[in-house]
């Protein structure tokens, strides 16, 4: 019997492999699709309850000196500060290698007959680069996306205490850490925001933030 996700109501059960989320975060040399390239790819798959499945993908992609020279001052400082730039120069991983690795992760955990949505924080730019530079990956993902930043903006307007008590981000500007922090943030919103009116107290928000931080702490060590 196939694994299913129960709902406690008289609705059709959903097979677990049909209910995955594919979390992808990219680091690029900039935001211009015509001039800039992907230099780091990280991916994780979660089930419907945000449990991380498997080891995921965390790869630095090689870029030429010419491609790196197209970075503006802000991106140059960011990648230098995070330690990414020397890793890019030393990497022997191609963008195709990284795309293949993410596709293998999806094949392992997801049902290809039911493409999973792309998930992340402010993922429109990531999706644009995926569409342009990793078209096979784009084709393997559902057209729908789960953008945690949309939930953040709603929380800021509808329940400010939830917004202001969210777990603090490390701002490492490295792809895998960014993904785990996005999953953690959505886990927090699930606990504190998607509840009946009048919503949680500030103390409950703080407790929910601590629970979400503890749940994902070992991924960020």
Curated annotation (Swiss-Prot):
Q: Which residues form the Exonuclease domain?
A: 21-186
- State the protein's name: Oligoribonuclease
**Keyword terms, alphabetized:** Cytoplasm, Exonuclease, Hydrolase, Nuclease
NCBIfam families on file: PRK05359.1 (NF003765)
Is-annotated flag, keyword Transmembrane?
no
Q: Which Pfam families match?
A: RNase_T (PF00929)
By sequence similarity, the record places it as follows: Belongs to the oligoribonuclease family.
Q: Does the keyword Nuclease apply?
A: yes
Q: What is its main location?
A: cytoplasm
**Main function:** 3'-to-5' exoribonuclease specific for small oligoribonucleotides.
> EC class of this enzyme?
hydrolase
Q: Where is the active site?
A: 143
**Which GO molecular function, any one, fits this protein according to its record?**
nucleic acid binding
Specify the superkingdom.
Bacteria
A GO cellular component entry from the record = cytoplasm
* Enzyme Commission number, as recorded: 3.1.15.-
InterPro entries, per database record: Exonuclease_RNaseT/DNA_pol3, Oligoribonuclease, RNaseH-like_sf, RNaseH_sf
């Amino acid at each position: 019997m196939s694994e299913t996700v129960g709902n406690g109501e008289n609705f059709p059960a959903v097979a677990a492999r049909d209910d995955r989320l594919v979390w992808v975060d990219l680091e690029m040399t900039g935001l211009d699709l015509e001039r800039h390239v992907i230099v780091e790819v990280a991916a994780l798959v979660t089930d419907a309850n945000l449990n991380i499945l498997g080891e995921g993908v965390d790869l630095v992609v090689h870029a030429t000196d010419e491609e790196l020279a197209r970075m503006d001052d802000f991106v140059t400082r960011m990648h230098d500060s995070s330690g990414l730039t020397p890793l890019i120069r030393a990497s022997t991983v191609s963008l195709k290698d990284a795309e293949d690795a993410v596709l293998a992760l999806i094949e392992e955990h997801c049902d290809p007959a039911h493409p999973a949505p792309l998930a992340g924080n402010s993922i429109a730019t990531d999706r644009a680069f995926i569409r342009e530079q990793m078209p096979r990956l784009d084709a393997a993902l559902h057209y729908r996306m789960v953008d945690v930043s949309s939930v953040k903006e709603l929380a800021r307007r509808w329940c400010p205490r939830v917004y202001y008590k969210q777990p603090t981000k490390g701002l490492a500007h490295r792809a895998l850490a960014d993904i785990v922090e996005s999953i953690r943030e959505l886990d927090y919103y699930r606990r504190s925001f998607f509840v009946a009116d009048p919503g949680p107290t500030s103390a409950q928000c703080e407790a929910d933030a601590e629970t979400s931080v503890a749940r994902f702490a070992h991924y960020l060590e």
